[in-house]
Curated annotation (Swiss-Prot):
Keywords: DNA-binding, Metal-binding, Nucleus, Repeat, Zinc, Zinc-finger. One of its GO terms (molecular function) is mRNA binding. It is found in: Nucleus. A zinc finger (C3H1-type) spans 51-79, 97-125, 145-173, 300-328, 345-373. It comes from the Eukaryota. It comes from Arabidopsis thaliana (Mouse-ear cress). InterPro entries: Plant_ZF_CCCH, Znf_CCCH, Znf_CCCH_sf. This is Zinc finger CCCH domain-containing protein 58. Residues 177-191, 397-431 have a biased composition (Low complexity). Residues 444-453 have a biased composition (Basic and acidic residues). Residues 1-26, 173-200, 274-302, 397-465 are annotated as: Disordered. Transmembrane segments: none annotated.
Length: 465
């Protein structure tokens, strides 16, 4: 197998180890120098072959030496100055090699990971030239190439591992509004912890107020502080309600600080308490939820419909989903929630999972009815129905004795060979229970024991006679 040299050269196919052993005047050091191309005091120009039809040896052009010597299959020009002149050593520039194929990666992305060691041609008017207009980026930092194919990975996940060097198009998902320049500066600088709010009507004795606010991009819920220090902001979902259910319902934001009442006219948490007769939570169709879905889920009429979105009205992929999300499916019909947080839809089909298990994994987004009558687990005995049930502390075969706390209780057991009832008197009241067997009569009367003694005496008299 020919590994290094070209065909027709005997010295390229011969093993140099035989030549080293044949020359008795050379030592091991000289052989090592010969292999490194340092033989003859550094005159490596005669050692390295010139092959005009082959590509230039990149290592030789950079360092001036070649470890393969005469066995190298690439070209080693004697004068490296013209070739090195084509190598641009400035930062961010790449070599120009006239006659070599054009670096396709450089033409697409404007960069080359091999740098000056790349063996292909990098024209100045190509991707890295100054004459080419730089590629514009979207607000996420990915390139916008309108004439190219869309990046499939970016359309699914919203990310791209190639970054600004990706050759495909990265459009902004429809329905998503890019943040303004001012908002981007706020996000890059970090959110303000204590932004200025409107002045509030607070007594003069309470001059030191604690105001905790969210960034301007994230709306919060303004509630009264329980300690009388003004208003503070709680995230959505933390506003207390008189009632609990395992399904998280959407909590709309409360009015702005300027519309809040004064401290003396509101409750502790700024929410009017519900009366005992009022339901725990009143829900209704919210316009903010539909508008959020319109901005969150993309509409792609040319793509198939998202089946999960059609069933539940939600999509876990969000803006990165590649399927179509029609808005008529995102606006559910007006429905009320039960006391456990599930929708009540009288005209719809009952939810089979709720009817069997009493729960629903879809929660308020379920399209079926969750009436309490459709569930097989709706029976709940009241505590009053369990007070009159008799409790037997002993097995039924030994009789049932009514419990009593009086000290004048008198219990009489009337037994015989057959089963007879037992009468128990407790404070003038009698209860009839099951009788006991003849085994109880043996314990109650000692007469059979005396009879046994008489029989044994007669037996001894007969034996002595």
């Amino acid at each position: 197998m020919e590994r290094y040299g070209g065909a027709g050269e005997d010295e390229s196919r011969s093993d140099p180890s035989h030549e080293w052993s044949a020359q008795g005047t050379e030592t091991g050091i000289e052989a090592s120098m010969w292999r490194l191309g340092l033989r003859g005091g550094g005159g490596g120009g005669e050692t390295f072959p010139e092959r005009p039809d082959e590509p230039d040896c990149i290592y030789y052009l950079r360092t001036g030496v070649c470890g393969y010597g005469s066995r190298c299959r690439f070209n080693h020009p004697r004068n490296r100055a013209p070739v090195l002149g084509g190598l641009r050593t400035e930062a961010g520039e790449f070599p120009e090699r006239m006659g070599q194929p054009v670096c396709q990666h450089f033409m697409r992305t404007g960069t080359c990971k091999f740098g000056a060691s790349c063996k292909y041609h990098h024209p100045r008017q190509g991707g890295g030239g100054d004459s080419v207009t730089p590629v514009s980026l979207n607000y996420m930092g990915f390139p916008l190439r309108p004439g190219e194919k869309e990046c499939s990975y970016f359309m699914r996940t919203g990310q791209c591992k190639f970054g600004s060097t990706c050759r495909y198009h990265h459009p902004v998902p429809p329905g998503v509004q890019a943040p303004s320049q001012q908002q981007q500066q706020q996000l890059s600088a970090g959110p303000t912890m204590y932004p200025s709010l409107q002045s509030q009507t607070v007594p003069s004795s309470q001059q030191y107020g604690v105001v905790l606010a969210r960034p301007q991009l994230l709306p919060g819920s303004y509630v009264q502080s329980p300690y009388g220090y003004g208003q503070m902001v709680l995230p959505p979902g933390m506003v207390p309600y008189s009632g609990w259910n395992p399904y998280q319902a959407s909590v709309s934001a409360m009015p702005s600080p300027g519309t809040q009442p004064s401290m003396g006219t509101s409750s502790v948490y700024g929410i009017t308490p519900l009366s005992p007769s009022a339901p725990a939570y009143q829900s209704g169709p919210s316009s903010t939820g539909v508008s959020n879905k319109e901005q969150t889920f993309p509409q792609r009429p040319e793509q198939p419909e998202c089946q999960y979105f059609m069933r539940t009205g939600d999509c876990k992929f969000g803006t990165s989903c590649r399927f179509h999300h029609p808005m008529e499916a995102a606006s559910p019909e007006a429905s009320t929630l039960s006391h456990i947080g599930l929708p009540l839809r009288p005209g719809a089909v009952p939810c089979t999972h709720f009817a069997q298990h009493g729960i629903c994994k879809f929660g308020p987004a379920c399209k079926f009815d969750h009436s309490l009558g459709s569930s097989s687990l709706s029976y709940s005995p009241s505590p009053s129905s369990l007070t009159d049930m008799p409790v037997a502390p002993y097995p039924s075969s030994l009789g049932t004795l009514a419990p009593s706390s009086s000290s004048d209780q008198c219990t009489e057991l009337i037994s015989s060979s057959s089963i007879e009832p037992i009468t128990t008197t407790t404070g003038g009241s009698e209860t009839v229970a099951a009788g006991v067997s003849s085994m109880t009569s043996d314990v109650s009367h000692p007469e059979p024991a005396e009879t046994n003694k008489g029989d044994s005496a007669s037996n001894e008299a007969k034996t002595s006679s």
